[in-house]
Each structure stands twice: as C-alpha cells, then as structure tokens.
Design a protein with these regions (language model features):
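N-terminal cap/lid segment of alpha/beta-hydrolase-fold proteins
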Residues: 1-24
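Catalytic histidine-centered segment of alpha/beta-hydrolase-like enzymes
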Residues: 271-281
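Short beta-strand/loop motif that positions the catalytic acidic residue
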Residues: 229, 235-237
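Short, surface-exposed "cap/lid" segments of acyl-processing enzymes
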Residues: 23-76
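Primarily recognizes the serine-hydrolase "nucleophile elbow" in alpha/beta-hydrolase
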Residues: 103-175, 206
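Conserved alpha/beta-hydrolase "acid-adjacent" motif
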Residues: 242-249
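Alpha/beta-hydrolase active-site loop
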Residues: 82-107
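Short glycine-rich catalytic loops that host catalytic nucleophiles or stabilize transition states
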Residues: 264-272
C-alpha cells in the first residue's frame, strides 16, 4: 500500500514523501534520503521499496529540501523562499529533514528505523547521525542501522573533475562573489556537474569541516565520523561509480579504517552510481543485511 505523508520540521518547513507499506503491519521502516537533483519518485526507490516490503519492512522515501534542481522551501505558515533544490540547498539543513522524518515515522508507530542514503544523501545521514548523537537525541536508540549507497568524496572528486588549478580558480571566484554579496548567484556552468549557487559551492568546498569525511585518498584520515556509527553499517557502490580510485582498493582501505563489527561493505558489478538495471540486486543485498540487524 502506498500513502502520501506530509510532515513539519523543527524549523517549520513542510516536506512530503511516499510511504510504501508491506502487506502486514510492521514496526520497522527504512527512511530513504536522496542525493543531488533527485526526488522520491525515482525508479530505484520503487524497486527498493518493493523488495524491502517483501521482507515485511516499510519504506519511506521523501523529497528533502535539496530535491530536484531548484525549488521553493515552503513553511507551514504559508511563507516560501527560493533556497531549495540542488542549486541552493545548504546540506547542513538536512539535519532537520532527517530528524523530522524520524519523528514522523515514530509518530506513525515505526519504532525500528533504518536510515538509507544515496550519494549526497549518505553525506547528509552521516552528518545528521553524528549531530543527533552529540546532542543525546532522545530517540537515537530507535535507529537500528545505517545504509550508505554510493558515498562520494565530494572534494577529491571535484578536484579530479576540474583539475587542481581550475578547482582553486573556481573556489577563489566563489569567495570573490561572496564578498560582493552575490551568494545566491550561480557559478559558471563549467564549475560543477549542474547549476549551483555560490553559497552551496562554498559549503561543499570551503565551509565543509562537518561534511568532508569521505576522504578516500587520505591514508592518514581516521574516518572518525563514520567510526562514530556503532550500529550496523551497510556500504555499497556501483562498479562504475563516481570514485577516483579502484573500488577493490577503496573497499580494502575502508575495511581497515572502519571499526564497526557489523560492517557490510562491497560493490555491485556492471552498474553505475545510480545502480541502473541492478536495482533489484541492490535491494536483495539490503534485505539480506536487514535480516542480520
């Protein structure tokens, strides 16, 4: 059964998502956090929901405030601001989105919660979970596991795509535009994968101390934010994913760096960052993992 669910966040923003219910009543749910330029209507979401519903677990996919390319952030008092979508979002605000989704699912009777992120959604989950843990969030124990699909090293990938000289040039340009009060203006079209505002660009590549924790090319990094996750942890990539290094090498590195005794890590062959044509394979691997939690 599919149900549309609206929910209000701590900062009064209203979001909406799709709750896929299994045939029998359950107290267990996967909350899915999408990545850049995405939404809860993806084919992948429908396939994962079907597979996970078959395991007797509900699946809640919602549009976070970074949904699609550009959108208004609407509040329950009727006001709206053009500061949403991948163009304008501040990834740190995902804390409110994720916390709000957790509390809505608890309100609906789901006491066993699994947080699942894709791409930037992984970044959002790791950041939000660490913040909730730091704040001694009263419902932290209801979070049973974390599922990270296609976690990306945001900074290193950008340097790889642009080259270090152009990377530095674009960062300097963003800082100059900020100094002129042009935070909401767009960066040059060749600075990023899609249109992006100055303020969002600076969040990813300058003001990123709280989200730059997937440092795959830094052999000395201790991955403390990921190691702060003590509950079961599932990580997957597609064989042709958005990573600079070879996946076999990356996975071996992370096996040595991540100290989680219930770590399930690997990649899926013959697919990409979005798991095209392998969504059901991914779903079955997630389902198998959830049975061990």
């Amino acid at each position: 059964m599919l149900e549309k669910v609206y929910f209000e966040l701590e900062d009064k923003v209203e979001l909406v998502g799709l709750l896929h219910r299994p045939e029998n009543t359950t107290d267990e749910v996967v909350i899915s956090i999408h990545g850049m330029q995405s939404n809860c209507f993806k084919k992948r979401e429908d396939i994962l929901a079907k597979v996970i519903n078959n395991a007797g677990i509900a699946y809640f996919a919602f549009d976070n405030r970074g949904a699609n390319l550009m959108c208004y952030t609407k509040k329950t008092d009727g006001t709206k601001t053009l500061n949403g979508g991948s163009v304008y979002e501040d990834v740190l605000e995902s804390y409110y989105d994720i916390k709000g989704a957790i509390e809505k699912m608890l309100e609906l009777g789901y006491t066993k919660i699994h947080l699942q992120g894709h791409s930037l959604g992984c970044t959002k989950i790791v950041y939000a979970y660490n913040r909730l843990k730091k704040e001694n969030y009263k419902n932290l124990e209801n979070i049973q596991s974390i599922i990270l699909l296609s976690l990306v090293d945001l900074v290193d990938l950008q340097k790889y795509d642009l080259g270090i000289d152009k990377y530095n040039k674009m960062l300097e340009l963003a800082i100059e535009k900020e100094a002129r009060g042009e935070e909401m203006e767009l960066m040059p079209f060749d600075s990023f994968d899609h249109p992006i505002s100055v303020k969002s660009y600076l969040r990813y590549y300058r003001d990123n101390q709280e989200i730059d924790f997937a440092k795959f090319n830094d052999n000395n990094y201790d991955f403390k934010e990921i190691n702060n996750i003590s509950i079961p942890l599932f990580l997957r990539w597609g064989e042709n994913d958005l990573v600079v290094q070879k996946l076999d090498e990356l996975i071996e590195l992370l096996k040595n760096k991540i100290n989680n005794p219930k770590l399930d890590i690997g990649y899926i062959k013959n697919t990409d960052h979005g798991y095209t044509n392998k969504e059901e394979v991914l779903g079955e691997e997630i389902k198998k993992f959830l049975k061990t939690v």
